């Protein structure tokens, strides 16, 4: 089941803005000075499009500067994260795959101690 409305997280918030068979579209706001957990997904790929703000996007050990217009394709199983620097980072995330839920997150490192034992 897809969560609707704004969902608060320690790093900011997200909301689902569209969904259909095999895809889910979210808007993520990572607050200045915060970052997502270092994570990977087994059942989906993600395509990130930065729409405002600045920060860094990491994928498989490479880091790129993020600003409006920056895009990143995160393949199935790729280790990745996004971080906001001095201003909020707004990302539109398109997920594609067979299992599109918050259960498909394997956290490898997390600033907010949300890793499962």
Descriptions of predicted regions:
Residues 2-9, 81, 85-117:
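Double-stranded beta-helix
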Residues 3-40, 44-45:
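A short glycine-rich, His/Asp/Glu-containing loop-to-beta-strand
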Residues 34, 43-44, 62, 78, ...:
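A generic "binding-loop/recognition-motif" signal
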Residues 43-56, 60-61:
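Glycine- and acidic-residue-biased ligand/ion/polar-headgroup-sensing regions
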Residues 61-79:
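Short acidic-glycine-tyrosine-enriched beta hairpin
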């Amino acid at each position: 089941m897809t969560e609707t409305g704004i969902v608060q997280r320690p790093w900011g918030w997200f909301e689902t803005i569209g969904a259909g068979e095999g895809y889910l579209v979210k808007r993520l706001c990572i607050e200045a000075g915060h970052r997502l957990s270092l994570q990977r997904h087994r059942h989906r790929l993600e395509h990130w499009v930065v729409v405002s703000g600045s920060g860094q996007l990491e994928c498989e050990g490479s880091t790129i500067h993020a600003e409006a217009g920056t895009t990143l394709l995160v393949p199935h199983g790729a280790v990745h994260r996004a971080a906001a620097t001095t201003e909020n980072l707004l990302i539109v995330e398109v997920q594609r795959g067979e299992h599109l839920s918050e259960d498909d997150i394997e956290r490898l490192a997390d600033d907010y101690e949300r890793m499962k034992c």
